[in-house]
């Protein structure tokens, strides 16, 4: 299941450089797409989360995350992608 919010500038507008940031996790993967035009301010294009069910096999969960990230790449065509370092621990 994906949840998303869209910023004020869909696609970032002409001349924008888009960057996709990903905060990975098997239960919840967060993401954000930001745009920067020239030396101007950075603006939010879209952000959200991809949630997977704990009872679902890992392979299926990874597939759901893959499909969601692939859709983001197709929709926004970012110039760069940044993935936060993964760590394992208990909350």
Annotate each PLM feature.
Residues 1-91:
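Phosphate- and other anionic-substrate recognition elements at nucleic-acid/protein interfaces
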